[in-house]
Amino acid sequence: MTSNYQEIKTPKAVTTESDKKISDGYLEIHRYRISHEKYDGNQTPILCREVMDRGSVGAVIPFDPIRQELILIEQFRIGAWAAGWPQPWLLECVAGIVEEGETAEEVVCREAQEEAGCEILQLEPIAKYFSTPGACTELVSLFCGRIDSTGLGGIHGLETEHEDI
């Protein structure tokens, strides 16, 4: 049996003309002027793109295998509000930013305590993915965390981070 599939080489070359930090507030944003190789071997013209430098995030889906329950958190998200979403309090996985010197595993165990009041008993990696690669550097390490969900609930979050979860 023959295939009509034509193998196409994935482009690899990117040329940076400039990288300018345009915001260093709550979020760091860079404006890049780049060109990149195309599938046909030619280069794109210079493209101007803004990118939010977010870094790495650890996220966990707390799961109680005995009770067959997943734990999600709910919190206000300004992006949903700014987009006009009718209910900007969103259901989410437990997650947090991986700071220098931390691992994603350490982050999700800490955040599970802070955001949901639960202890992760065992972690299983699920995937690593970019959340919004068209405009953000955020790389998410997603885990399933075995927990005992007995008695969980309530309001959580750190006062110092203005969390209301």
Question: Where on the chain are the PLM-derived regions?
Answer:
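Conserved hydrophobic/aromatic beta-strand scaffold that supports enzyme active sites
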Residues: 29-31, 72, 142-144
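Conserved Nudix-box catalytic region and its N-terminal flanking loop in Nudix hydrolases
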Residues: 49-52, 61, 69-110, 152-161
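Active-site-adjacent beta-strand/loop module that shapes the phosphate/pyrophosphate-binding cleft
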Residues: 34-38, 132-153
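Alpha-helical and coiled-coil interaction segments, frequently adjacent to or embedded
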Residues: 2-13, 23-26
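Acidic pyrophosphate-coordinating catalytic loop
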Residues: 20-25, 41, 83, 129-140
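A short coil-to-beta-strand element that immediately follows conserved catalytic motifs
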Residues: 15, 119-126
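Acidic, metal-coordinating catalytic segment for phosphate/diphosphate chemistry
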Residues: 22-67, 81
